[in-house]
């Protein structure tokens, strides 16, 4: 069960308009580093006293709420540190933009704390998934939807760039 929806954004002046709208609508938010996404998420988790993060990124407009619930339930019940949609149970495929567009990532704050201690750079503005997928101490789980991946490989369901 999701307890809080928190918008995490940056301290940059360009996000001031967003924060003003969030305040007017009484929506919880947290502002942090524009370069260190991992630290921003960790600081938000500590501020709001949560132990699990389900990351529905702003560029993932087709995220399926049923998968949000599934990710949350698995993280609460299983000894898993990181969960993500994927086209395989074995190895993470960063190029599968269909599955990544509908299934959010989720992770335990305890794993995020350990990654923040071990990371060598504070610049991870392009994402954090590789930190979780590349570290052996992280217990990973991939949700593999029952779909025809030969068709979905051609479909991109996230909005990372203007051409998307």
Pin down the residues of each PLM region.
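Conserved core of the sugar-phosphate nucleotidyltransferase
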Residues: 63-155
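Conserved beta-strand segments of alpha/beta enzyme cores
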Residues: 4, 28, 139-141
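Short phosphate-binding loop-to-helix
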Residues: 12-76
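An accessory alpha-helical subdomain
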Residues: 156-163
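N-terminal glycine-rich phosphate-binding loop and ensuing alpha1 helix
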Residues: 1-14
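Short, structured coil segments at secondary-structure junctions
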Residues: 1, 25-26, 136
């Amino acid at each position: 069960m999701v307890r809080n929806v928190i918008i995490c954004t940056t301290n940059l002046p360009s996000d001031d308009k967003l924060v003003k709208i969030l305040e007017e609508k009484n929506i919880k938010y947290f502002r942090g580093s524009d370069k260190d996404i991992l630290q921003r998420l960790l600081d938000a988790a500590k501020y709001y006293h949560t132990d699990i993060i389900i990351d529905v990124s702003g560029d993932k407009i087709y995220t399926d709420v049923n998968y949000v619930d599934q990710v949350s339930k698995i993280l609460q019940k299983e000894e898993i540190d990181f969960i993500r949609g994927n086209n395989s149970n074995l190895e993470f495929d960063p190029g599968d933009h269909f599955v990544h567009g509908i299934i959010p990532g989720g992770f335990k704050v305890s794993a995020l704390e350990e990654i923040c201690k071990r990371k060598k750079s504070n610049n991870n503005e392009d994402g954090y998934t590789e930190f979780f997928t590349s570290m052996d101490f992280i217990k990973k789980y991939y949700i593999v939807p029952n779909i025809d991946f030969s068709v979905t490989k051609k479909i991109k369901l996230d909005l990372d760039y203007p051409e998307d």
